[in-house]
Amino acid sequence: MKKVKEAEKRNIKRKKRIRDRIGFGVADRPRVTVFKSNKYFYVQVIDDVAGHTLASVSTIEKDLKLNKNIDDIRKLGEVLAKKLKDKNINKLIFDRNGYKYHGLIASFATSLREAGIDV
């Protein structure tokens, strides 16, 4: 149990260190944050100053019918890019939320860049 608590503390410390480094999202350049569960992948675009979520997508949405694999995560990035372009948001701050920039996280960020969003 002690090892689990220490791992949780390390994860929280890593998240805080990353958030301190990237700064806050504002209306003209909001923060996009990702969360991976064992089954699903969630993404939110957040304006930290106003405290509002501007857009969100996830693999749990029934109309998308996506799984948690690299190809579907790329599609998820394209869907989010379309939502952001409809709201005239072209620049984002990418918050990887403590995860390594590899695999699903990297493919999601790449799909946003390919869709024309400056990350």
Curated annotation (Swiss-Prot):
Keywords from the named record: Ribonucleoprotein, Ribosomal protein, RNA-binding, rRNA-binding
Positions of transmembrane segments: none
Pfam annotation, one family: Ribosomal_L18p
GO cellular component terms, semicolon-separated: cytosolic large ribosomal subunit
GO molecular function: 5S rRNA binding; structural constituent of ribosome
UniProt GO BP: translation
InterPro entries the record matches: Ribosomal_uL18_bac-type, Ribosomal_uL18_bac/euk
N-terminal signal peptide: none
Biological role: This is one of the proteins that bind and probably mediate the attachment of the 5S RNA into the large ribosomal subunit, where it forms part of the central protuberance.
Stated family: Belongs to the universal ribosomal protein uL18 family.
UniProt subunit comment: Part of the 50S ribosomal subunit; part of the 5S rRNA/L5/L18/L25 subcomplex. Contacts the 5S and 23S rRNAs.
HAMAP family: Ribosomal_uL18_B
Name listed for the protein in its UniProt record: Large ribosomal subunit protein uL18
Encoding gene per record: rplR
